[in-house]
């Protein structure tokens, strides 16, 4: 209700907008064991998966086909994925889907990625912020 009141103040003409987005779960392998998560599988479980870059890209193609503009990409803390895998994934997605806004990785994932890679969380975030492309030049 408060959001509707604010919208009416900002847009008295009655304009309403929305985003078409999609959640993409790139892996369900995780070592964290969060109490609220029924999605994860521990390493070695026979129901684990990690999608290839091409599989993730196909999910984004499906979003683009319906006019979508953003993905939320999350998974687990997969100890088999090196830091470079995440960098390569983001670079691949930016190159192949330049018009899609990428909203990737939860704080716990970033902490886990850093730990698996022998980095501090600050180093991991700083490195990705400074080196990853945000759009194709």
Segments (PLM) and residue ranges:
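N-terminal pre-triad scaffold of radical SAM enzymes
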Residues: 2-43, 48-72
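Conserved small/polar residues in nucleotide/adenosyl-binding loops
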Residues: 128-134
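Glycine-rich beta-strand-to-loop/alpha-helix junction loops that act as flexible
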Residues: 74-76
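Canonical radical SAM enzyme core domain
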Residues: 44-57, 78-92, 96-127
